[in-house]
């Protein structure tokens, strides 16, 4: 009887998911979960409320999923999806996802019941504010979030609103000294928070939770996977790596040309000079100060 009960329970758990070409889909605690391997080391996680219909076309991801050899097994309420380089565990009772290397080293885990969907009215369209929390190690340094003006290297222990700004370019992405990266694929105003209790993303608008886990083993490997997802960044031409002259602004074309001439007169190499905001003028046409070339 005990053996039969165990068999039925295990069968019940097994029926909570089904295989897809890239991984599995499951519904746990009223949340649809889609775990899809884009490569042996890159996994996409999609979550949405059960019954919610939506279409998500990324504005950032251009990489196409590779055909990845996977093994899927279920034991003790834990569903395990493995490539030859990365292991993903799904708790079939709580929906918690954890990521580990192929040799079993823990990399990152979601918090238990760490996904949340709050109703949001987006200019008359029903959608959600979406939230996902993770647990990082106490002394785990992370880098990224874009080009910020906060003077920090590691982006731990802060709350940061990620929105494009005149002085800051934000990217909802970080990479860890443990050799993985996390890309939160959402373009609405987003709160990144890290404290002793959690590391989380909260986006104002989203039909789903959508993020990518990238395991590169080191920083270069993570960047390589991010390029695979979002495209190569072209190198600047050689001359841009030389000496540049910059100041708050120049008042006229005569002034800026005079500075260049003085550099030439002194024999000081100059590869670029920056004319900042004064050229804008009082309307959209720009070129307000006779930069006539």
Residue locations for each model-derived region?
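Bacterial Sec-dependent N-terminal signal peptides
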Residues: 1-16
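Short N-terminal segments immediately surrounding and downstream of signal-peptide cleavage
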Residues: 15-29
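Short, surface-exposed charged micro-motifs
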Residues: 16, 32-34, 71, 87-89, ...
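A low-complexity, Ser/Thr/Gly/Pro-enriched, surface-exposed linker/loop concept
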Residues: 17, 21, 36-79, 116-120
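Aromatic/His-enriched, Gly/Pro-containing loop or helix-boundary segments
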Residues: 57-84, 151, 159, 284-293
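Catalytic and substrate-binding clefts that recognize carbohydrates or anionic sugar/phosphate headgroups
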Residues: 74-238, 247-248, 253, 258-267
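Structural preference for beta-strand elements that scaffold enzyme active sites
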Residues: 240-242, 272
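Aromatic- and carboxylate-enriched substrate-binding clefts and catalytic-loop regions
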Residues: 269-293
